[in-house]
């Protein structure tokens, strides 16, 4: 666990300053990175010539910042271009200590298969440092384009290959035995699903009884799971967290990762494909993509999780309904037909369990 405890703590009297704001200041970043980051990248002989800071689109209270640094060798007085280089890093900040756990996990994954190997085209961002004084985690920037953006283009011939690669990446993750994974909390899950149920019942009173019963059934099935089948899951394995670059696939955002049912990641990913097809009216054969995804996964790992994929597809469909019409209620008014559609899809999945 390689944390960097800084001597220069946030100045007294800056209580109202968000710690992440320091990393939006080019002068601060240049000095900070030269002292604390470049040595960790074996770049101590370089100085920062220029720093470009880009605050990425972020979830509430979870900002991410891209740092593009142009470096020059300190021993290169002539500033020859061949002595210059650039690097792209991403810093993530939270107001809790979850990123400390995430950093530990990424370091363990890096050392247990994601640093090198025959399948080194299946990647994670390289963990660089965690700064507890600022609750900031720093990692390399993922190269390529989001699979979610490619999905919206609807080119099945291109998507098929990357979705198969996504299955290989997930099998690689699920095959790794980790020590630093956070345990799944059934208590947290119960509270979360209860809130989703209450919100959706408020938005769709005509479907309230059915919605409540579906959430209860999902929770009952989760309570009955045998923890012997649990392993490390990503927890938010969706196309927007997957970057493709030629043959390489890099997956980001491990904050929801924990020790739980591997089928969760499978069902969640497939549900994202299905919801994207409906939302954007994409000309995709999602059933075929699902089959190819699961076939590739089970060719590399146990078929045991397949019998529970429907459970997590069902959960994800209701999560999608909640996110679209409750979390995003300022943009989307309740849609009775859409609600009926996702309830039907949820029931279909649970009937097969």
Which residues fall in each region the model found?
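Juxta-kinase regulatory segment immediately upstream of eukaryotic protein kinase catalytic domains
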Residues: 1-55
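An alpha-helical support segment within catalytic cores of ATP-dependent transferases
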Residues: 28-47, 52, 114, 178-234, ...
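ATP-binding pocket architecture of kinase catalytic cores
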Residues: 53-62, 68-184
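Active-site acidic catalytic loop and adjacent metal/ATP-binding pocket
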Residues: 53-81, 85, 135-138, 219-264
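Short, contiguous acidic/charged loop-to-helix segments that flank catalytic cores in large enzymes
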Residues: 94, 157, 240, 254-260, ...
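A glycine-centered beta->alpha junction motif in the catalytic cores
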Residues: 133-156, 172-179, 195-202, 275, ...
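Active-site activation/catalytic loop segments of kinase-like enzymes and analogous catalytic loops
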Residues: 263-301, 314-332
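Amphipathic, Lys/Arg-enriched alpha-helical patches that create a basic surface
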Residues: 340-353
């Amino acid at each position: 666990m390689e944390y960097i405890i800084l001597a220069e703590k946030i100045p007294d009297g800056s209580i109202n300053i968000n710690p992440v704001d320091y990393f939006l200041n080019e002068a601060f970043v240049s000095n900070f990175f030269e002292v604390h980051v470049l040595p960790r990248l074996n770049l101590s002989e370089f100085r920062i010539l220029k720093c470009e800071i880009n605050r990425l689109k972020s979830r509430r209270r979870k900002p991410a910042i891209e740092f593009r640094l142009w470096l020059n060798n300190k021993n290169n007085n002539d500033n020859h271009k061949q002595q210059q280089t650039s690097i792209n890093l991403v810093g993530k900040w939270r107001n809790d200590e979850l990123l400390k756990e995430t950093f530990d996990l990424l370091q363990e994954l890096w050392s247990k298969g994601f640093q090198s190997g025959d399948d080194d085209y299946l990647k994670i961002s390289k963990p660089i440092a965690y700064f507890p004084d600022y609750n900031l985690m720093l990692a390399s920037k993922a190269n390529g384009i989001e699979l979610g953006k490619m999905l919206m283009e609807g080119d099945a011939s291109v998507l098929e290959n990357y979705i198969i690669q996504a299955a290989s990446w997930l099998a690689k993750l699920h095959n790794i035995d980790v020590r630093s994974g956070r345990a799944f909390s059934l208590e947290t899950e119960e509270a979360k699903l209860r809130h989703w149920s209450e919100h959706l019942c408020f938005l769709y009173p005509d479907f309230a009884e059915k919605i409540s019963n579906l959430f209860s059934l999902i929770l009952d099935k989760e309570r009955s799971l045998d923890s012997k089948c649990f392993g490390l899951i990503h927890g938010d394995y969706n196309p927007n967290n997957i970057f493709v670059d030629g043959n390489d696939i890099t997956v980001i955002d491990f904050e929801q990762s924990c020790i739980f049912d591997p089928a969760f990641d499978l069902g969640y990913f497939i549900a994202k494909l299905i919801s994207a097809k409906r939302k954007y009216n994409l000309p995709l054969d999602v059933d075929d993509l699902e089959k190819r995804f699961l076939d590739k996964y089970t060719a590399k790992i146990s078929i045991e999780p397949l019998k529970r994929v429907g459970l997590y597809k069902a959960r994800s469909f209701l999560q999608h309904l909640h996110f679209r019409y409750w979390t995003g209620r300022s943009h989307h008014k309740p849609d009775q037909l859409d609600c009926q559609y996702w309830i039907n899809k949820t029931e279909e999945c649970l009937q097969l369990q």
